A protein has these predicted regions:
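Hydrophobic structural segments
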Residues: 1-135
Length: 135
C-alpha cells in the first residue's frame, strides 16, 4: 500500500474525482469512479500502479476511498458490492502511467541529491497505451 491519509477538508467523491482529473495528466481513461457521487470522503488509501491485489487490505477497507490503477472487472465489482453491503471504500481508478507520473520529479530530485555527479533526466514520453475512448 502506498499511503493512507486524511484530507485537509472533507469533500465528496465527485469533487475528489474532479480534483484528481485536474491534477493528473489527461488520458483516454480519465478517472473512473465506483460509489455514490455525493459520498463524503475524509480518509484516502492510495496505491500507485496496479492495486487491485490490495482491495481486501484492512487499511484499504477502512478508508473512505481507494485510489489506484488497473482495476479489473471482477475484483472491482466484488469490492463495490462488498462496500455496499458491509461498508468499505469507494473506488477511483486512474491510468497506471498517470498514477506513477506524479512522483517522477520528486524521485529525480532525490537522485540528483544522492548522486550529484550523475545526470538525471525525467522522460517526457507518455507511456499510457490508450490514445482515445469513445463514450
Amino acid at each position: 500500500l502506498g499511503r493512507v491519509g486524511r484530507l485537509a477538508q472533507p469533500m465528496t467523491l465527485g469533487a475528489l474525482a474532479r480534483a484528481l482529473a485536474d491534477v493528473l495528466p489527461a488520458t483516454a481513461q480519465g478517472v473512473r469512479a465506483a460509489g455514490d457521487f455525493d459520498r463524503t470522503i475524509e480518509t484516502v488509501a492510495l496505491c500507485a500502479g496496479a492495486g487491485d491485489s490490495l482491495l481486501s487490505d484492512p487499511q484499504v477497507r477502512a478508508a473512505d476511498v481507494y485510489i489506484t490503477s488497473d482495476l479489473r472487472h471482477h475484483p472491482a465489482s466484488e469490492a463495490r458490492e462488498s462496500s455496499r453491503l458491509r461498508g468499505g471504500p469507494a473506488l477511483l481508478d486512474v491510468s497506471h502511467w498517470a498514477s506513477e507520473w506524479l512522483w517522477l520529479d520528486t524521485a529525480a530530485a532525490q537522485l540528483r541529491a544522492a548522486l550529484p555527479t550523475a545526470e538525471v533526466l525525467v522522460s517526457e514520453l507518455r507511456t499510457d497505451p490508450w490514445d482515445f475512448a469513445i463514450v
